[in-house]
Amino acid sequence: FPLGIAFLYFWSLYGGWSIVADGLGADSQQQHHYLYWKVFPVELNEEYLWTLLLYALFVLVIELTLLAVVRSDRPHMDQAAEALWISHTVLLVIAALAAGTSFLIVKDQLATAVLLGKSGYSVTRGGLGEMVPLFTLHQVLNRVALFSLAIGIGVWFTGRQGRWLAGNATLVTGAGYSVLLGGMFLYVTALGNKNELFSALILGGFFHLANTRRVKWGFVGAGAGMMFMGIGLVDFLRAFPLIDLWEGGAWWDAIQWVPEIHASNEAFGAHLSLYGALYFHSPLTYGSSLTALLFSVVPRILWPERPGDIYSHYASSVGIVEGVGEQGFSIHHATGWYLNFGLPGLLFGAVLWGWIWGRCFNAYLCAEATRDRGGRWRYAFAVMAPWGFVAYIPPLIRAGLEGYKGLVI
């Protein structure tokens, strides 16, 4: 819960400190001002005051809902209970197939990026004038591959002694995880997909802590440090042309930049969205996200004019040009609900968020008690639910209510 609340604070309110400080004449040392001419300038006016108040209200309602939903009577956990046995081979095959299919979707765009001297991040996100067909499926497959590796590696290091899930940790499967993880790191570096890598780190790390009977903090710290460095590298290298990554010169610059990752503008893109909606008086859509969510089961390649999500409405209402391929602007989850149903929608969205999060944790607490009644799949879902939800907070907080589709998948 503390990490999840920290995520909410970071993407909701943290960026406000720098904006207010700079607006009052101080120097926050944050390099976010370029967003003002790419999106819109921010003034310390009434709209920005309401932006901060509504974000704070959104986070507070989530916390209060959690307090109301999470069980206070925790069932007894039998430490000697037998864990559910999983197959590392199956997880490796799933990860390999998902990664391979994802690559097939974007291989032509990556080849074009090499020829034109562009970054993979740019060309796969509209830098060539249009989005990649099946881009959403590509993103889902990326997460499937990384999450399968995260779960598998977490279980591999607990071996046969896992509390919830266990498996036969052989050198062959360990080598398979190493090769696939290295390949996926190079792949997401070429794509610039740092958020998927970050979510996988959270899922694998927290599930390992929950699953192991004896925490090796030195190992956990070393693993977290290496992954943090990897995320920093991806964040820096995502803007480089693919040919520069191949030649290798950019990697040393990226390693030197990693300690400066705190200066990333990650906290500002979504934070600005509610201010934009209030300042430009963006009209409410009264449920367009529900329509978009319903019709999203049809791939856009089959229905090019499929109703757009709430970000498209937000972007058009504040004057952001979509598909420019240079900047991954996003919308805050609270803004998505606000643009659908106003203040009641924002409050309902916060309650729904807290209720789902609390139910995920309750399912984990009751996993052992319901194992015989629910079957293997329900048990596996229960023991993974809270860690999976927290791992998905970074992408969910930067999406409208349509983001729940990705959570379910």
Question: What function would you assign to each model-found segment?
Answer:
Residues 99-112, 219-309:
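Aromatic-rich transmembrane-lumenal/periplasmic boundary elements in polytopic membrane proteins
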Residues 113, 117-125, 288, 292-334:
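Interfacial juxtamembrane loops and adjacent helix segments
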Residues 1-22, 164-177, 370-386:
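Membrane-interfacial loop-to-transmembrane alpha-helix junctions, especially the N-terminal start
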Residues 35-37, 68-220, 226-244:
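Membrane-embedded catalytic interface detector for glycan/lipid assembly enzymes
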Residues 326-409:
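Hydrophobic alpha-helical segments
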Residues 37-51, 121-142, 253-260, 336-339:
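Short aromatic-rich membrane-water interface segments that cap or initiate transmembrane helices
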Residues 53-62, 89-101, 138-152, 335, ...:
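Hydrophobic alpha-helical transmembrane segments
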